[in-house]
Amino acid sequence: MRQFIVIGHDVPTDPDAVSLADLPGAGRLDVLCRCLNSAFFLSHDLRDNVRVWLVVGDEYAIRFEGSELRRLNPDERSTAALVRGALAAREKAIGSMAANPSPGVYIRTQSLSGLLESVADDGPLVTLHEDGQPVVDIDPSAEPTFVLSDHHSFDDAETALLAAHADRRVSLGPEPLHADHAITVAHNYLDTDGYNRY
């Protein structure tokens, strides 16, 4: 299973602070919605072998399971409604037990540190960063967990956590990419067996 962990630095944890009419004003929730859409959507289908984690406020981890998703649509507004619905269910997430407010959407109380520890055995943990090694150094047959940031760079604490937990720091090309575009390029690399099969 391919996994993507996206850190949302400014997204509010209070669902009442998330206006579907102003996604950029909701801590740039629009960026996270584009990441979700890039992770799951194909031309006429959804990727069912993908899991996306949104880390919100370093307090909640919202998980989207491709094999279970039923209400994900390609527009940012309806995607944001799923995120807001997850945040509205946050108080039902007790300890490490997740709440499940919608098919394929789960929320639990968990920091980035705890999430990195919980996915450590799932496959190689790869930080996507413009200063990393070229992506071609990653074995495309592996099922990596990619970690990337929203419109902000990783802060010092996140950088230290990733240095301690990640197996690699990888760049997807010579130019910095938006997070949602980086997800598309990472998918393409894995889909083509390292750019060898089209």
From Swiss-Prot:
InterPro entries: Alpha/beta_knot_MTases (IPR029028), TrmY (IPR007158), tRNA_m1G_MTases_N (IPR029026). Keywords: Cytoplasm, Methyltransferase, S-adenosyl-L-methionine, Transferase, tRNA processing. GO terms for biological process: tRNA methylation. S-adenosyl-L-methionine binds at residue 128. GO terms for cellular component: cytoplasm. One of its GO terms (molecular function) is tRNA methyltransferase activity. It comes from the Archaea. CDD domains: TrmY-like. It is found in: Cytoplasm. Its EC number is 2.1.1.257. It catalyses: pseudouridine(54) in tRNA + S-adenosyl-L-methionine = N(1)-methylpseudouridine(54) in tRNA + S-adenosyl-L-homocysteine + H(+). Homodimer. Specifically catalyzes the N1-methylation of pseudouridine at position 54 (Psi54) in tRNAs. HAMAP family: tRNA_methyltr_TrmY. Belongs to the methyltransferase superfamily. TrmY family. This is tRNA (pseudouridine(54)-N(1))-methyltransferase. It comes from Natronomonas pharaonis (strain ATCC 35678 / DSM 2160 / CIP 103997 / JCM 8858 / NBRC 14720 / NCIMB 2260 / Gabara) (Halobacterium pharaonis).
